[in-house]
Amino acid sequence: MYTQTIYELSQEAERLLLLSLEHLRLLQQLPVASLDGVAQEDGEGNENTRPQHVSGRDVEAQHGTLNNELRKITRLEMVLAIVGTMKAGKSTTINAIVGTEVLPNRNRPMTALPTLIRHTPGQKEPVLHFSHVAPIDTLMQTLQQRMQACDRQHLTQVLEIDKDMNALLQRIEKGVAFERHYLGAQPIFHCLKSLNDLVRLSKALGVDFPFAAYAAIEHIPVIEVEFVHLAGLENYPGQLTLLDTPGPNEAGQPHLQKMLNEQLARASAVLAVMDYTQLKSISDEEVRQAIAAVGKSVPLYALVNKFDQKDRNSDDEEQVRALISGTLMNGSITPGQIFPVSSMWGYLANRARHELRVHGRLPDHQEQRWVQDFAEAALGRRWRSADLDDIEHIRHAADLLWEDSLFEQPVQRLIHAAYANASLYALRSASHKLLNYAQRAREYLDFRYHGLTVAHDALQVNISRVEEDMRQLQVSQDRVSDEVGHEVERMMEAANTFLSQQQADILHRIAPLFR
């Protein structure tokens, strides 16, 4: 019954979205230039009465939003957008949520392009799909030409060239294009690092990166992997997907703010990752402004990362919740939706527990460096290699580290709930976007109706005035015609009288001549 109800509601939502898209197409065809004069006259001195124009940009944005909701409702997909700065540990938090390392960690911005991470049951090894790769190929060809004309010494002065950037430069010189699919963590890391380094390189060479080509969510890279926390759970109607968004002004690219705002507005819910040690910093303030701009259109949650750095003089959990909810977010997020955590501890603990569950032991700490990080966090700085051989001790230490990370609560209340109710989130998101579009369309059409009504009334008044003027003109014309006729008759009579007198006078004078 539940599944059937969800299906019927999704079908109705799909019908309404298609109807709204058709309505938007018709709305786009309405002439708007004629409203400018009305706006200036009617809105003079009153800003609230100015028209709401349907510009090409507005229509494109609304069209993208509705199409995005149509895509989500077709898949019953709940998209949880994750926003935060590089220093807040956004990538680490996503890795902790997924339960394995799907995003690379570097000490520089790593999200020039949004990336989807979709929970795919049974997909143990992550796979990245990058179908819309053509704009990147074109960019690399342009960069290849610029590099041929650019002095390498000059490039080193305007760009930090590390081993990853050097590999990218060699790749561009050789004309090696991006693949459409990458299987495994390391190939995915290499792809994402290269994409982000392309942004830095493009800026250094004065070439525009094709951000606009990736405004649509179906064009951005997608990583499919089974979330460890959701493995083995009951299959629910719907799909859970994380959206890794670019941070505000990330990598010195201020125009990414527009892309961030659009992606947040199109999400089903928003999860902000904040830095416990920098809650009042400028960077975290930019994150707060970004999610505050979304308003009440989507549910908001917050993870306060790096809570493991709390000391006896720092704010505790309740104080942090009160600070963020009240002072920093002005009540736009409730304390119950704020979770202080340690993403690094959560990621390391869950990764270790997963390795123990699947392989029965941890990998060699010399080959996989995360094992060293785990050992230091769970066993202390004085751990030894032999400690890793005590499987029961390691399992217990991983459980304690997971408990200390405080990640269990957000996983249960947010991730599990989002997965179980993904279809409901998708329906809620579609309903809200439909209502928002309907309200904006109604406001615009009401204004159009008001403008046309005012124009019609004014036109009727002007027509009446013209008709009255024509009547007055006719009356004046008739009066003048009578007066002119009368004057002509008087002049004709005077002329005839004068001619008769002259004739009589002439006859009187010439009469003696004929006697």
Outline where the language-model segments fall.
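Catalytic cores of large soluble enzymes that bind and process phosphate-bearing ligands
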Residues: 5, 54, 58, 316, ...
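Secondary-structure edge/capping motif, primarily at the C-terminal ends of alpha-helices
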Residues: 27-38, 277, 417, 421, ...
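Long amphipathic alpha-helical scaffold segments
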Residues: 45-80
